[in-house]
Amino acid sequence: MESNDSGGVAAKHGFLFQDCVAAYHVTRMLRDKTIRSVRCEVTDDIDIVSDGYIDFVQVKSTGKTRWNISDIVQNSKGADKKTIPCSSILHKSMQCESDLSLGRRYSIVTEEKVNKTLEYLTISPNARLDKPGRQELIDDLNKRTDNFLTDSGISVSDWIDAATWEVFSSLRELELLGIKNIRLASQDLHGVILSSETVAEDIWCRILDTVTRKGEHSRRIHSADDKSYLRPDLLEWFKQRVEDDQSRSGRKIYVKRDLPHILTPFRAPMASVCAKRKGQVLHQQYSLKKYRYKHIADNVCQWLDEVFLRPKEMSDIHKLTFIEKRERLKNSVFKSLHDVSEFLGRVLLHATIRQHHESQPIPCMLYVEKAGAEKILENVHIVRRDPEGDQLWIGFSELVTDINIAVRLPEIRDQLYEDISDCIDTARKKILDIKDDNYLLRHDIDEILDGSQPFDAHLDRFTFVLFVGYDSNLLTEPETPGFEDDLEKETAVLFEKFAADLIEDSPFANLCIHVFIYPAPSLERLTQLVDEKVREVV
């Protein structure tokens, strides 16, 4: 009996090749937030659902030396060896239907290369302008298919313009590309390097197993979602795999530093007249009728390295001796201790954003180019979103002690509006220059920092954050029980005053602004304790 790979061996290889292509696209989905899901055997062999379109993928793994134009228009034959009309690769691909709201793209994936007749399809659609071969290919295919047109009006020329041909020469090539995506996704999404190649290979095998099982589900019994790998499910599962690897390898994930909450939310967020204005009261509690000043001062010190050291300084700090660490931190912190109130506000705002949004801070102190050097912000954070574009949170703080908070809060708001109007473009450029992507998780904020685009083009991706502390007569030393309801009313009135300009049809109504209000018994006492504690620690 002749030994060859026809029949069952070839069929099994073909199914495995198709599943590896699907698994590869799932690993792409880890790093590409525009991909929403990868469907297995729903419409075509693989359907890649992205923002605005579906890419219908046909996978072929025959033992051809080279693919030519006749191969994609050759109709299949049925059980009686009669030709089945419109059953060729081209016909099937053209007839794939997407939702009315989504466009169509088409892909053919093979192990073998194409000859000159199909070479045009291997060119990236973005690079096809002025490339020869398009019209010749259209004319030839129209001739071979009698100017075939689908029921939904898709012509051969439509298909050509939306189609690409990809070649993966082996299963191993797909596996290596998928494993590369897995390792990069671990760094991009979670800021860590997987402990070994074995871990990445295991994740690949699990993804491959999942797409195989989804592809096997019956179309008659199961829904399209049952046969789809959805991005939210993938991200949640992948995060758990990375965290499991980190816990086994004993390494701490930097981006999830176990730092303490200095202040906590007081009741629910405040009601707002506008979705673009959000308010939250922060507080610290009493213990044995004494306000927890010491708790705040102690925990402020836990955040000093992250607030006052540059990313490279933090990454290198494990190499230093204890004395060197203290000296480096001391030099950075003492530069800011000349104004303890400003120092404290900066740390409290930083810790609040980090704890509540798992943000990535960009250490900087930006000054606007006005008359003199006036600081407009001290906290800049990237808040990642998925699948939406990442946001940039820009903020500053003020601890109000020498003026009525009800008077000062609207003034702070008006000053913010003025600074945004005059200086946001300068600030965007400086943030772009300052941030060091070597120490940040993968993000897409560069596009909103691009000065060639107006600030207004990305309003929904900027959030301005105000942290305002003040002395409240309702918080006494020692504690007067039962103050909570009155404190809620007092802070609600303050927030209403802050947002009152929106009722007057403010031109800044579309700015997204978060206000954190922090009432305390005595900010003067708190800043004094913080000053003493910080000098003691560093």
From Swiss-Prot:
Disruption phenotype: About 20% increase in T4 progeny; the phenotype is the same in a double abpA-abpB deletion. GO terms for biological process: defense response to virus. InterPro entries: AbpA_HamA_C, Cap4-like_endonuclease_dom. Keywords: Antiviral defense. The keyword Disulfide bond does not apply. One of its GO terms (molecular function) is nuclease activity. Part of an antiviral system composed of AbpA and AbpB; when both are expressed from a plasmid they confer resistance to phages T2, T4, T7 and lambda but not RB32 or RB69. Resistance is temperature dependent, it can be seen at 30 degrees Celsius but not at 37 or 42 degrees Celsius. The system impairs phage but not bacterial DNA synthesis (shown for T4, T7 and lambda). Partially suppressed by mutations in T4 gene 41, a replicative helicase. Part of prophage CP4-57. Interacts with AbpB. This is Anti-bacteriophage protein A. It comes from Escherichia coli (strain K12). The lineage of its organism: Bacteria, Pseudomonadati, Pseudomonadota, Gammaproteobacteria, Enterobacterales.
